[in-house]
């Protein structure tokens, strides 16, 4: 499969609509409807210039819509999107499906987002993961990466990134690393690989929005003034149609508090749990703000690094359970793939082949 060269551009965020009573909303809707009808527009056809002027009234699609019959060992499920764009005043059309894979790289992060035309990698595991991760991505037929992003400069997030960048070389469009300058050999290797590639290097800025085919992704946080590297993680919200994902890197409760105060729309269907499920992440108030149906934890098995770091923490798992959030863990299921058609999410899990076969 070929991956086209797509360029990002900053887009205007949706205008916030003032809240009114239901009666006023209905009256406004009917008024616009009759104006459009008198102008010769058919039912359901709205001129593009009117989109920002209309506040759509629709029933929310909250809540799971039943189970997919999948592998009983993986707990495959299908759920509708909580983030109903009709309620927010926009209708987004997408074509095809988008895959978001939380690749099993042990006590580390590597997230691959792709469809038939575009691909984006967020983090790349530890140093030994670089070549196996590259082999796995290539085994999917992906020969071009639109974006490669390192959420912060810890080895378990950028360790394998130099291998990925070197392997794809001229087939990487954009590279984004944290502005927090690192001092480790791992960091220097990634910077050297980025400098040697033909990719344009992007500077992360909170609020900036980019495109990935029909998907958009926005940087919500990248504060390098935080005292800890984890707290300066680049936090990204990805939206595809009426579905959304929040990727938090190793964000802590301090980062989460800043996000809650930022004014950004945090509500997302899927939450990548911060810092491998550590006790210092995933606060109750943050879960209230995000309101995810699904949470994914990228972590090593308890017999290995996970036990050393006590990840995921019992307290974090309890908070997720108390909020009624379905949890998927890479140490239990392997690589976790969530596929979106823009309206519903399908979850599957499998052992990752990293030998390129």
Predicted feature descriptions by range:
Residues 15-33:
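N-terminal Sec-pathway targeting helices
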């Amino acid at each position: 499969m070929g991956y086209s060269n797509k360029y990002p551009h900053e887009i205007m965020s949706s205008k916030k609509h003032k809240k009114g009573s239901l009666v006023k909303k209905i009256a406004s809707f009917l008024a616009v409807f009759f104006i459009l009808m008198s102008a010769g527009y058919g039912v359901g056809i709205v001129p593009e210039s009117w989109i920002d002027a209309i506040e759509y009234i629709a029933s929310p699609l909250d809540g799971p819509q039943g189970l997919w019959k999948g592998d009983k060992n993986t707990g495959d499920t299908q759920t509708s999107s909580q983030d109903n764009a009709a309620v927010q005043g926009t209708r987004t059309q997408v074509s095809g499906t988008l895959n978001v894979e939380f690749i099993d790289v042990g006590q580390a992060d590597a997230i691959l987002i792709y469809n038939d035309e575009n691909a984006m990698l967020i983090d790349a595991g530890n140093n030994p993961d670089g070549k196996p991760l590259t082999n796995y991505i290539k085994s999917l037929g992906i020969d071009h990466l639109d974006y490669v992003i390192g959420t912060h400069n810890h080895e378990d997030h950028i360790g394998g990134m130099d291998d990925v960048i070197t392997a794809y070389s001229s087939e990487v469009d954009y590279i984004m690393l944290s502005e927090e300058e690192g001092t480790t050999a791992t960091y220097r290797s990634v910077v050297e690989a980025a400098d040697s590639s033909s990719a344009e290097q992007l500077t992360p800025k909170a609020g900036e929005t980019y495109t990935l085919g029909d998907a958009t992704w926005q940087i919500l946080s990248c504060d390098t003034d935080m005292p800890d590297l984890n707290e300066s993680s680049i936090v990204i919200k990805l939206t595809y149609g009426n579905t959304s994902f929040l990727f938090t890197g190793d964000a802590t409760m301090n980062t989460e508090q800043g996000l809650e105060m930022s004014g950004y729309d945090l509500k997302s269907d899927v939450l990548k749990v911060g810092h491998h499920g550590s006790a210092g992440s995933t606060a109750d108030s943050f879960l209230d703000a995000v309101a995810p149906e699904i949470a994914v934890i990228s972590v090593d098995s308890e017999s290995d690094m996970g036990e050393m770091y006590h990840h995921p923490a019992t307290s974090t798992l309890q908070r997720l359970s108390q909020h009624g959030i379905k949890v998927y863990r890479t140490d239990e299921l392997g690589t976790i793939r969530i596929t979106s058609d823009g309206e519903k999410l399908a979850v599957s899990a499998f052992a990752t082949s990293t030998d390129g076969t």
